[in-house]
From Swiss-Prot:
The keyword Zinc-finger does not apply. GO terms for biological process: arachidonate secretion; lipid catabolic process; phospholipid metabolic process. This is Phospholipase A2. Binds 1 Ca(2+) ion. It comes from Bombus pensylvanicus. One of its GO terms (cellular component) is extracellular region. Keywords: Allergen, Calcium, Disulfide bond, Glycoprotein, Hydrolase, Lipid degradation, Lipid metabolism, Metal-binding, Secreted.
Length: 136
């Protein structure tokens, strides 16, 4: 399913090439960049010692953070907000990154209960781990 007016926002893309964008160009450009994240773990795939249990691809946290920033700065306010809420809030996904081992979640959001702040063991070596993606 691709969001109307875009070619890149949704499951896969329907573009004829990497330079083609839909009607909502700024939102679509954000989705295209997100789709091209170089560090991903496919659905049910493994990488960096992690296995993705989800039915969709998960990305390095840096790519998700860039995606959020891009959507917030998009001139296509309505389509960007819809895509942002769908991906970050409704999907409730996780991203991964290299960091000190998580000891526990220090602060959870009130409604969706995603972890907003983690406590880390800074004496242990860093490793790849899953992190909650915050709501849009």
């Amino acid at each position: 399913i691709i969001y109307p007016g875009t070619l890149w926002c949704g499951n896969g893309n329907i573009a004829n090439g990497t330079n083609e964008l839909g009607l909502w160009k700024e939102t679509d450009a954000c989705c295209r960049t997100h789709d091209m994240c170089p560090d991903i773990i496919e659905a049910h795939g493994s990488k960096h010692g992690l296995t993705n249990p989800a039915d969709y691809t998960r990305l390095n946290c840096e790519c998700d953070e860039e995606f959020r920033h891009c959507l917030h700065n998009s001139g296509d306010a309505v389509s960007a907000a819809f895509v942002g809420r769908t991906y970050f809030t409704i999907l409730g996904t996780q991203c991964f990154r290299l960091d000190y081992p998580i000891v526990k979640c220090k602060v959870k959001s009130t409604i969706l209960r995603e972890c907003k702040e983690y406590e880390f063991d800074t004496n242990a070596p860093q490793k790849y781990q899953w992190f909650d993606v915050l709501s849009y």
